[in-house]
Amino acid sequence: MNLPPRSSTQLDLEALADSLSASADALHARLMRAIRQPAPGANPPGISQAAAQALFENEVILRQRANGLYLEAATLAAAGLGGMQQQLLDLAAQAQEKIRKIDKIKDLIALTGELLSLAAAVASGAPEKLVAPYEKLKARVESL
């Protein structure tokens, strides 16, 4: 499992996505403040419904764009998986099938937690972070 180091392109995409997410957070906080605290001398709320709706839509779009950049960065990380890619796809498919059939909520929580850990490891592009989540998910899938 030799993954290449994270590229500067991948890091740049993640940094931009982080910035867009932070901007969306700031927009949300400012919008909520405007809704709760009207301008001096104005009646509540301090923003019209149309303006609030437009700003909420902008917040959602910022988050969608950030998520798209995170996805692009993860795609770059996944491209370097080489031969592991098929093993990861197979294991993810097995996990998906188990998710469909699981009866116990605690097993569902544990399985999805392992799957999320593996997804995070893949997105990180760090080979040392991939082995443990892969093995844990594989063991969990086999135990169900």
Say what each PLM segment does.
Residues N2-R6, A139-R140, L144:
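Intrinsic-disorder-driven secretion/translocation and chaperone-binding regions of pathogen effectors
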Residues G82-E97:
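Membrane-proximal, non-transmembrane alpha-helical segments
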Residues Q94-E142:
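Membrane-inserting effector segments that mediate pore formation, membrane fusion
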Residues A34-Q37, G41, L69, L76, ...:
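Hydrophobic stripe of amphipathic alpha-helices that form coiled-coil interfaces
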Residues S23, R65, M84-Q87, L108-L111, ...:
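Amphipathic, well-ordered alpha-helical segments in soluble domains
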Residues M1-A79:
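Terminal export/targeting leaders at protein ends
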